[in-house]
Design a protein with these regions (language model features):
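A beta-strand edge to alpha-helix "cap/lid" segment located at domain peripheries
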Residues: 2, 48-125
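A short, structure-level motif marking secondary-structure boundaries and short turns
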Residues: 3-4, 35
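Short acidic-aromatic low-complexity motifs
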Residues: 4-25
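Short, flexible active-site loop motifs that bind/organize anionic cofactors or intermediates
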Residues: 9-12, 36, 107
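A solvent-exposed, acidic/Ser-Thr-rich amphipathic alpha-helical stretch
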Residues: 19-71
């Protein structure tokens, strides 16, 4: 698979099958960072971070608006749609930067507005 296909397959697995299934696209030494927060490492770090987020937001539905690749790097502009338990659904604009090695994501950084996230989830900053 091309790097773009790996990222697309990862996002689709997260949408359709959930966190556990999506981890098959994460490299053992992956570094994942939601840029307002410290990085985590490996599939277990990705798993723990996503599950922690989804406790607050409910499951995600990723809508990729635009995507480009340069070599092993894939950049996408997304709306991550959330439906918090007991709250109102909200879209979160996200810019994602991925590096793919073989058929696995080795680096993943997401950039988003923490204030928008807090407003959507009802969390205070």
């Amino acid at each position: 698979m091309s790097p773009q296909q790996v990222v697309n397959a990862f996002c689709q697995a997260l949408n359709d099958e959930g966190v556990e299934a999506s981890l098959r696209y994460i490299a053992d030494d992956c570094v994942y960072q939601n840029m307002p927060f410290p990085p985590v490492h490996g599939p277990q770090g990705v798993r723990d971070t996503l599950l922690g987020f989804f406790e607050i937001t409910g499951p995600v539905r990723i809508e990729t608006l635009h995507q480009a690749a340069a070599g092993d790097y894939v950049f996408n502009e997304r709306l991550d749609h959330f439906a918090p338990p007991g709250g109102r659904p909200f879209p979160l604009p996200v810019a994602g930067a991925f590096q793919v090695r073989g058929d696995k994501i080795s680096t993943w950084r997401d950039y988003f507005c923490l204030r928008q996230f807090a407003a959507g989830t009802g969390l205070s900053l």
